[in-house]
Amino acid sequence: MQVKKIKKRKKVNFFQKNNIKYIDYKDVELLKKFISPNGQILPRRITGTSLKDQRQLALAIKRARQMALLPYVIE
């Protein structure tokens, strides 16, 4: 049997690519891209965001949840 080699594509930081400096908690459509189907915040290794952007993203998602713009759990 021959083993297939899987090429991993390089993850690109979405916020640097689109020149987004500030992640707004009121931009719900943007934040939904970084939430799993269960409602959890996706980690950096999956999204490809930088450390600084991931911190801002997590803070924005938590603020949106607190303001009831995003649900805590999706059923």
Curated annotation (Swiss-Prot):
What GO cellular component term, any one, is given?
A: cytosolic small ribosomal subunit
| Alphabetically ordered keywords of this record | Ribonucleoprotein, Ribosomal protein, RNA-binding, rRNA-binding
Which Gene3D superfamilies did the record assign? Ribosomal protein S18 (4.10.640.10)
One GO biological-process annotation of the entry reads: translation
List the InterPro entries. Answer: Ribosomal_bS18 (IPR001648), Ribosomal_bS18_sf (IPR036870)
Q: Name one GO molecular function term.
A: structural constituent of ribosome
This protein's superkingdom? Answer: Bacteria
* Record flagged with keyword DNA damage: no
Give one Pfam family: Ribosomal_S18
Similarity field: Belongs to the bacterial ribosomal protein bS18 family.
Per the entry, what this protein does is: Binds as a heterodimer with protein bS6 to the central domain of the 16S rRNA, where it helps stabilize the platform of the 30S subunit.
**PANTHER family xref list:** 30S RIBOSOMAL PROTEIN S18 (PTHR13479), SMALL RIBOSOMAL SUBUNIT PROTEIN BS18M (PTHR13479:SF40)
Per UniProt, subunit arrangement is: Part of the 30S ribosomal subunit. Forms a tight heterodimer with protein bS6.
Name of the featured protein:
Small ribosomal subunit protein bS18
Q: Which organism is it from?
A: Mycoplasma capricolum subsp. capricolum (strain California kid / ATCC 27343 / NCTC 10154)
Q: Gene name?
A: rpsR
